Amino acid sequence: NAPSEALKRACIPAVFVEITVDNSGCSKQRGAVFGFQGSDPYSSMRHICGDTNKFLCGIGQGLHAAIITGDKDVESGLVFSIDDLIFPKNKAHLGFGLGNIGGLIFTVPAHEKKTWKFVVCFYRGGNVTAGTGSTYFYTQYFSSVEDVAAYGLLHFDYYRERAVLSDKMVLSSELSQERIFSLCHSIRSYCGSTEFLLIDNKPCWIVNEGEYRMINTLDLTVDHLFFEMKMNPW
């Protein structure tokens, strides 16, 4: 019964990334690259450009994954080798639609420190399960990976604040740094093994048993009980 906007904001299929490059102690400009190598042989890497009121620059693979930024001083490049992104022989070649490696390139002037915001977006439309057919819940609110990016960039500060608030839950504890890292990694791995689906127009929250892609068995209930009571009391 939650409001539509609240559900949309909660189920966005995206990861929010801030990258800060501190070049304040250097007399030369410094460049950085953020990207990935496509692994789907049936979906080509591509440049993503759109309405400047939403986003300015991005790279993606097919229709299901992308990295997009709203910062103006970023260029996209598609290449066959990461070296060609960092040390391009001809910058014009970066704009070609060839190559299985895509990256966003940004530069910090000498004696400056800058931060960029990126939204790593995902999208799978249509039926996504066999046996019992289902769609991802977020497809009710987003129509494409570009749509996800536009919304994510518009509300980036909100998601950043939520992430900082979430970090305080563990950073304020008396756990060692090693245990804090392990706990944060475990929570993210747990969330990464979940699926929020729509089956017969009804929401269905599934927790898979990690890499096995099975629904959790009863013996794991004890392991999850304390986590669920804290994080998902419903």
Set out the residue ranges of the language-model regions.
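Acidic/polar, glycine-enriched structural segments that form the non-catalytic walls/loops
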Residues: N1-A14, E18-N216
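Carboxylate/His-rich catalytic cores and anion/metal-binding grooves
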Residues: L220-W234
